[in-house]
């Protein structure tokens, strides 16, 4: 069994497609078909078999999943998370991070005072957006770029932004 720290979320089943048990897979890899080059597992570390059928205009993959053969079976998979082993991923360049490593990181201001944490990382198609949860539990969305986040380490990020805190 694998710890979730050893797994990287790289896709999620969005919905079913058609009557033959096909699913729409939202891949978090770039390009989206790169997910098929990895050994895929579920949260427990059990292998997952996915076969590409086609790709839709949104870049989502239409696939067969394990031995699912009917629409009813496929409907039960909505939201199913797909992982790969961290050790199977390529080494990152300096200033590159996996989203899984940034989630919940401590956020410091320019004077190294803790002001909150990264609550979530979102992408609606125009780039990554960081959802910040401040110490007072309020949240704010900011673009993930060097202007707002000039320093990123494995333990914390520095926020260059005048907050209300």
UniProtKB/Swiss-Prot annotation:
Residues 94-165 form the PRC barrel domain. Pfam families: PRC, RimM. The keyword Electron transport does not apply. InterPro entries: PRC-brl_dom, PRC_barrel-like_sf, RimM, RimM_N, RimM_N_sf, Transl_B-barrel_sf. Its main location: cytoplasm. It is found in: Cytoplasm. One of its GO terms (biological process) is ribosomal small subunit biogenesis. GO terms for cellular component: cytoplasm; ribosome. Keywords: Chaperone, Cytoplasm, Ribosome biogenesis, rRNA processing. GO terms for molecular function: ribosome binding. Gene3D superfamilies: PRC-barrel domain, RimM. It comes from the Bacteria. Belongs to the RimM family. The PRC barrel domain binds ribosomal protein uS19. An accessory protein needed during the final step in the assembly of 30S ribosomal subunit, possibly for assembly of the head region. Essential for efficient processing of 16S rRNA. May be needed both before and after RbfA during the maturation of 16S rRNA. It has affinity for free ribosomal 30S subunits but not for 70S ribosomes. Binds ribosomal protein uS19. This is Ribosome maturation factor RimM. It comes from Rickettsia prowazekii (strain Madrid E).
């Amino acid at each position: 069994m694998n710890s979730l720290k050893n797994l990287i979320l790289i896709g999620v089943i969005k919905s079913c497609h058609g009557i033959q048990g096909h699913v729409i897979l939202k891949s978090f890899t770039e390009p989206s078909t790169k997910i098929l080059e990895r050994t895929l597992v579920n949260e427990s570390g059990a292998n997952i078999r996915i076969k590409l059928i086609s790709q839709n205009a949104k870049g989502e993959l239409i696939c067969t999943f394990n031995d699912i053969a009917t629409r009813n079976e496929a409907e039960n998979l909505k939201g199913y998370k797909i992982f790969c082993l961290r050790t199977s991923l390529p080494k990152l360049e300096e200033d590159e991070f996996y989203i899984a490593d940034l989630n919940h990181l401590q956020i410091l201001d320019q004077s190294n005072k803790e002001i909150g944490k990264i609550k979530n990382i979102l992408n609606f198609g125009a780039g990554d957006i960081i959802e910040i949860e401040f110490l007072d539990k309020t949240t704010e969305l900011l673009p993930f770029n060097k202007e707002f986040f000039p320093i990123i380490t494995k333990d914390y990020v520095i926020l260059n932004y005048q907050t209300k805190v």
